[in-house]
């Protein structure tokens, strides 16, 4: 050991053969994740121009059915339901009591837009959706995720105009904001945002548990109190006003849905159809298969889905962190849902795209993950809305399109899983160092290890 003045040992640089000493004056978040601090301002003007042009095309496709959507099924159908619910709410009716809602209570926030008319409500909804879209794009770029921002920019074109016509765009915004809050150690805000996402789509409740692995134990209480408090404040008033039975009926209806035609588990049912068996497709909360065969497949799907969630929780409880951060847990959970759920609506790919965009810049197979994500979006758009009628009317294209989509989903799941579990060394935590003992003053000596005198191989 040797002693040198504390004012000079930083300036002489690393000694031959020694490990680099981390700069203790730099915040841990900046040392560990320099890529996330690469951009102090928003995306350049050309990036915003590309974003705006793709959004203009998407909105025109949604509202006016321009090429190639002239004969495709309309993606705006749910917007009319939202407008009707908004009218009921503004008329003084109580959700879940006076009229039925098929979503959790978080949807009420978006029903609060003034329903001057159906057209005005749709314009308001799409405007808010575009704002959420822009905020996600800006947040991804500012956090140093350039590849993620590019992926998010092109995702609507690959998936189709349904991108802004469902509530999932707001779920994606809440998830991105929550992950960034965790990275910046704003755990209370992260809990509030994840609870908000849970109030629109139930599955983020599982993420609240998973991301505890990315939060220091001393901050768990603050995070969990914020999340549970938000859920209680949102649900208790509805229960007190008599909406409890309607809310429970809505949740039970979601749980008992059949196998949706876009699901991986729809493939054997399409095969049965092609073989001449009667397996009808019905329209309800979703477009799903019905009949005894579909019920058996749905039971298997539910079992596999539960096993997938248990697997995610097991990895969290055993400390097997994918990517060692909250974004990795989000992608792992989103992948499990897409792969194993009997309900796979196209809009689910909105928050899947957000999850990939958060991870892709630091993933071990980033480019490959981005490419397969785009392929998944395109394959999903082919099923809905482009070839929707071919899928539901029992034509010969149903089976090959379902098989193609299932193969892409499985391939995506494999790449995504390996991307968050095989993280390159440079993406991990920076090496730590025991603090040196300072004796007195700026020139007090500190003890540092001498370099290994043996030559470096």
Kindly label every feature range from the protein language model:
Residues 1-2, 232:
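N-terminal secretory/membrane targeting signals
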Residues 2-11, 18:
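Low-acidity, Ser/Thr- and Arg-rich intrinsically disordered low-complexity segments
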Residues 16-252, 297-457:
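Multi-pass membrane glycosyltransferase architecture that uses lipid-linked
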Residues 244-301:
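Periplasmic/ER-lumenal interhelical loops and adjacent helix-loop junctions
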């Amino acid at each position: 050991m040797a002693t040198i003045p504390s004012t000079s040992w930083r300036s002489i640089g690393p000694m031959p053969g020694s490990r680099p000493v981390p700069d203790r004056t730099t915040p841990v978040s900046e040392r560990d994740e320099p890529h996330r601090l690469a951009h102090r301002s928003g995306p350049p003007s050309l990036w915003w121009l590309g974003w705006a042009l793709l959004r203009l095309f998407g909105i025109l496709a949604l509202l006016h059915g321009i090429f190639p959507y002239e004969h495709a099924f309309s993606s705006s159908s749910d917007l009319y339901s939202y407008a009707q619910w908004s009218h009921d709410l503004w008329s003084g009716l109580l959700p879940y009591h006076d009229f039925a809602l098929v979503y959790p209570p978080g949807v009420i926030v978006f029903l609060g837009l003034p329903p001057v008319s159906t057209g005005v409500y749709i314009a308001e909804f799409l405007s808010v959706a575009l704002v959420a879209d822009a905020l996600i794009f800006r947040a991804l770029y500012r956090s140093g995720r350039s590849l993620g921002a590019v992926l998010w920019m092109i995702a609507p074109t690959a998936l189709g105009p349904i991108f802004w016509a469902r509530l999932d765009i707001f779920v994606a915004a809440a998830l991105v904001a929550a992950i960034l809050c965790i990275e910046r150690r704003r755990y209370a805000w992260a809990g509030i945002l994840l609870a908000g996402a849970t109030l629109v789509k139930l599955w983020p409740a599982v993420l609240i548990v998973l991301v505890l692995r990315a939060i220091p134990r001393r901050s768990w209480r603050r995070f969990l109190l914020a999340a549970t408090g938000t859920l209680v404040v949102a649900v208790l008033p509805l229960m007190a006003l008599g909406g409890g039975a309607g809310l429970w009926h809505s949740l039970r209806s979601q749980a008992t849905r059949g196998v949706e035609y876009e699901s991986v588990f729809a493939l054997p049912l399409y095969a049965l159809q092609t073989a001449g068996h009667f397996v009808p497709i019905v329209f309800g909360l979703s477009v799903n298969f019905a009949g005894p065969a579909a019920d058996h497949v749905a039971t298997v799907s539910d079992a596999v889905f539960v096993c997938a969630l248990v697997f995610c929780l097991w990895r969290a409880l055993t400390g097997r962190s994918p990517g060692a951060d909250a974004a990795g847990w989000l992608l792992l959970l989103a992948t499990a849902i897409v792969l194993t759920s009997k309900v796979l609506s196209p809009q689910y790919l909105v928050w899947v795209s957000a999850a990939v965009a958060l991870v892709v810049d630091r993933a071990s197979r980033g480019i490959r993950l981005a490419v397969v994500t785009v392929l998944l979006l395109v394959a999903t758009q082919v099923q809905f809305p482009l070839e929707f009628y071919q899928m539901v009317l029992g034509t010969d294209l149903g089976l090959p399109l379902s098989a193609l989509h299932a193969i892409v989903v499985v391939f995506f799941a494999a790449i995504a899983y390996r991307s968050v579990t095989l993280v390159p060394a440079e993406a991990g935590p920076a090496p730590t160092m025991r603090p040196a003992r300072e004796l007195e003053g700026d020139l007090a000596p500190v003890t540092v290890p001498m370099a290994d005198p043996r030559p470096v191989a």
